[in-house]
């Protein structure tokens, strides 16, 4: 997987997903926690609750802004976050480079920030996606899908248009709320049979010790997908930085931690 949402399950990437884990979205949602719509979002732009019947969120391009400066998921172009950890087997090393580019992608009429997310292991490429994010006027960060770069003969090749929202039944969802509150539960992305990720806000994640530095206050979320029963994934976020740590709560042994933040 990659740091954004879980890699969308197309035939071209299924083999890669068997080993790659990084900061992907298809993690885990909490067990039977209370839900509400995206905090601060109007009824017209709130995604459906992760519980109950699915209803696609109406998207109004006029309700989106050009920047992504949500405190818990700031995406400043030129910033690269680097993570180290292990893959699903708990042994194989991996490095994830989460690079916020200056590129833009139009999806469903919304101008999205493009993030290049690359996973390597022992110096060899494993997976690369280009993920699309946009922030609404209320401060919620939305996920609009991704492109996957084909891995062939040990090198990244052509792009595979593997999951833009608004096509083939795929719908966007939230990556981070403007005002996360304990018990909130929402869809990250909804594409039946390919990506059906949900997030639940667990509350404070407490103190974390990382190679990059230690943080006293963190936000803890948990993700899951019906496409991966039994797999639960937790993420720790820090204001002003974004995701700093991810670890499997059940189903696998994946783990990844922030080691550096650079700006250029």
Regions from the language model: what does each represent?
Residues 4-5, 20, 36:
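Absolute N-terminal positional cue centered near the fourth residue
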Residues 28:
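Short, conserved catalytic or interaction motifs in soluble domains
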Residues 2-13:
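Bacterial N-terminal signal peptides that target proteins for export
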Residues 13-19:
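Hydrophobic helical h-region of N-terminal Sec-dependent signal peptides
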Residues 22-25:
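C-terminal motif of bacterial Sec signal peptides marking the signal peptidase cleavage site
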Residues 34-264:
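Conserved functional acidic sites
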């Amino acid at each position: 997987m990659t740091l954004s949402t879980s890699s969308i399950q197309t035939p071209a990437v299924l083999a890669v997903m068997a080993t790659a884990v990084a900061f992907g979205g298809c993690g885990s949602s909490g067990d039977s926690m209370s839900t509400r719509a995206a905090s601060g979002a109007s009824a017209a732009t709130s995604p459906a609750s992760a519980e109950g019947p699915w209803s696609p969120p109406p998207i109004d391009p006029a309700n989106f802004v050009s920047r992504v400066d949500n405190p818990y998921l700031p995406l400043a172009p030129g910033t690269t976050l680097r993570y180290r950890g292990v893959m699903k087997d708990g042994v194989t090393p991996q490095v994830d480079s989460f690079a916020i580019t200056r590129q833009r992608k139009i999806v469903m009429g919304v101008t999205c920030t493009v993030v290049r997310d690359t996973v390597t292991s022992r110096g060899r490429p494993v997976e690369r996606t280009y993920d699309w994010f946009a922030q609404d006027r209320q401060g919620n960060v939305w996920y609009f899908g991704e492109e996957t770069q084909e891995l062939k003969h040990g090198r990244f090749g052509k792009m595979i248009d593997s999951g833009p929202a608004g096509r083939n039944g795929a719908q966007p969802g939230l990556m981070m709320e403007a005002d996360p509150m304990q018990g909130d539960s929402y869809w990250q992305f909804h594409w039946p049979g390919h990506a059906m990720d949900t997030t639940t806000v667990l509350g404070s994640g407490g103190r974390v010790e990382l190679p990059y530095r230690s943080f006293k206050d963190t936000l803890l979320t948990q993700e899951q997908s019906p496409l991966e029963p039994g797999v639960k994934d937790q993420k720790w976020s820090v204001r002003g930085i974004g995701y700093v740590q991810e670890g499997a709560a059940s189903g696998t042994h994946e783990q990844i931690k922030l080691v550096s933040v650079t700006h250029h």
